[in-house]
Amino acid sequence: MADVKNNEIKQYIGIMLGNERYGVDISYVDNIVRLQKITRVPKAQDYFLGVINLRGEIIPVMSLRRKFELEPDGFGPKSRILILKPEAQATVGFVVDEVHEVLNISEEDIDHIGSGDEKATYITGVGKHASGLVSLLNIAALLAAENKEKENAAN
């Protein structure tokens, strides 16, 4: 029997952090909002910017730049907050420099990073798109790490 290639098309929201392009699985994205006043929370992690009130819902907001130890935040007119609502977890916002178009990437055009690779923690792979290469974020791992840090801080 011939090998059947997995030709499933996945959709990602294309975002920019500095000069780097990333993709966020569209199934996690609940909303994209303009940058607004973020209320700081005392004694929080450096990458935790604070909380916002979005239509009556208090949402924690993190800086992906700080989480990935990139250059400091440079909020500008194109900065946005990506509101993510993963299954069975609390809603969270990530500040990004820019939000681009929806990227359609075939499963066969994704080079997955091996689990032994240190980069694999927050990146699931690299997608090949007509507009260039895109690092695909592992949102589940990002949120799991955040929850683990909260638990450790509580103990």
Task: Identify what each model region corresponds to.
Residues M1-N155:
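An acidic, low-aromatic, low-complexity terminal/linker signal
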